Amino acid sequence: LALPDALEEEYTIPEIAVEFELQKSYPSFEEFENYSDLDCDWDDYDDELEKLGVDADRDAENHKLLGYADTIQGEMLTECECVSRGLYCGDAESYENTPDEVKADIEKHAGDWMLLLQLSPVTKGGFEWMFGDCGMLYFYIRKDDLAARKFDKIHFSLQCC
């Protein structure tokens, strides 16, 4: 697809160099708590991350390809599975009213999803790219779909403060 000829400059995104760097990635406490068999409270989890050298005040510009998301409003694996089944996720009440056997199956398959790409705000020169109020864009994919390169099966989510 080509861009329209009359596209105003304010609606374009400049070319920005990207550098890749291998980093360790850890799940959020909520994701760890939901999908781990270990019994752990927030303080213990936070202490362990600190021992591993994880900075709780991560850099605001933290794009990721794979790994675990730096969530703002909570883990999204359950949301991905719900939406893939056509369930509404606009409020907590919808999930609470889902039958228990369906919730159990959703929770069983939520772990099939993984972060594909996380995009955070960018400030370069005079250019600023923001998503809501300091938000991030998240693209999730099922592990099997990634292996099969089915990128049309991606789930997108925006979280912001």
Model regions and ranges:
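Preference for intrinsically disordered or flexible, low-complexity segments
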Residues: 1-161
